[in-house]
């Protein structure tokens, strides 16, 4: 039976052992151990049995260069495929590879056209325009017949109840909101006219309710007309009596 030392001597030549002993590492860094030195030149051993030796593993270093992350000019990180799958296992290597794919997609998205960047995003200009349109109401354009009907009703009734508003809106072909808005604007003009005509106070309260006796009712208007007619009749009777007395 052959001694193990003799087998080792058969695997490695004597000059290789001398070169290994002659070289001393200056530090214990991995880079110092794994880098090649000019004075350490070992002829590669031959034979199928030598490929599993310690020196063969250290000299070949199949995965040393791949473990260092390299970045090309585009800034895309490239991860090794075979070392991770061999050393880290399937779950961890698949997770890292998926992360690398995400980095590649994210970095390459900078070179995509503008329409691809904006895909799936709302246009802020269109959103702002829609908000302004929602805040503003379109101005209603009334016809002459509608304006005449509203003015006649406003002369008789400055404030409308809900049933009156519904009836007026249906008769004129308008909505209740349109009638209400028109009445509010018309009352504001009416208040200004009253104040400009010499009125000391507005005919309505700050909350919009009319003051007492500021708006005459239909009964009061009829009584005023009756008194005016009576005054006219009395004036006409008095003038006729005076004429008869003058003739006598």
UniProtKB/Swiss-Prot annotation:
Sequence ranges of Polar residues compositional bias: 237-248
Location within or outside the cell: Nucleus
Region (Disordered): 197-248
Biased composition (Basic and acidic residues): 223-234
Known DNA-binding region: 135-194
CDD domains assigned: homeodomain (cd00086)
Keyword Nucleus: yes
Name under which the protein is recorded: Homeobox protein BarH-like 1
Function in brief: Transcription factor, is involved in craniofacial development, and in stomach organogenesis.
Top-rank lineage group of the source organism: Eukaryota
InterPro entries from the UniProt entry: HD, HD_metazoa, Homeobox_CS, Homeobox_TF, Homeodomain-like_sf, HTH_motif
Family classification: Belongs to the BAR homeobox family.
Cross-referenced SUPFAM superfamilies: Homeodomain-like
Keywords noted in UniProt: DNA-binding, Homeobox, Nucleus, Transcription, Transcription regulation
Organism: Danio rerio
GO molecular function per UniProt: DNA-binding transcription factor activity, RNA polymerase II-specific; RNA polymerase II transcription regulatory region sequence-specific DNA binding
